[in-house]
Amino acid sequence: MGPDQISERRVCRVLEQPRGTQRYRAKVKDDERTIIKRMHALVRRHPRRGYRFVHAMLRDEGFHVNRKRIYRLWKKEGFKVPQKQRKKRSLGVGVNGIVRRRAQHKNDVWCWDFVHDRDESGRPLKWLTIEDEFTRESLALEVERSFKSCDVTEVLTQVMLIRGVPRHIRSDNGPEFIARALQNFLASAGVETLYIEPGAPWQNGYAESFHSRLRDELLASELFADLREAKALSAWWRNEYNHRRPHSSLGYVAPAKFAASLAEPPLRLGAAPLACATAQQATDSVHPTLITAGT
């Protein structure tokens, strides 16, 4: 008798295993196939419910089965409750959102907004940010304890004197941005305002993206001793962002380098900025955190 012809009786005797154990085949209860089939139907109908819910439904349908058995069959069949998905938001589909009113060239659309933080003594710090949506340049990164609408107008005037006047400027409906004096200023400069819908910050997506980087790379890593230090570090970070930091949406080119590669659009000088300050005053009063010419 060859090795492949050893009898089952001899193998079981050598291994000291009962022949009954060797020949055992698991018995499927008569109702198990029916229960599994019904479980599949219930899972398809109620995909967000678990095995306890399925057990309760089966009990209501007249199946005499305990919860532990349903749990075993649930695992055996590989049922899982899918993770709840967040409802997707439409990105900028409002009338003045970033999809319908997308920047087509440099100085076409600017966006601005505020970011808040505190210094180490707990006193508030407030940043005014202005960006060119096409080139992704940070045109201004001003920090103060607070801003009034006249302060916002002053910063914007200085940026316009250096950069020219944009065709549009996008913002939320914050009180500083909807002040009548500021609206009159923008109208006289020939700038169309793009106010996003209330409670829809994603419609100002470029500003939100910039703020995310600002928080991650500066605000979250620095504890500002006072306003003066916040101003100095903001100026340093803005320069790094514009001139050294590769931007993924620009093909990993720094915003200033990308802007320099573009053909210059016609310079638009609105009446209001020129009436607010002379070129000499602008040179003397430009904040260090405003963008410089040629970037």
Each PLM stretch: what is its role?
Residues 1-295:
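Charged DNA-binding/catalytic regions of mobile-element recombinases
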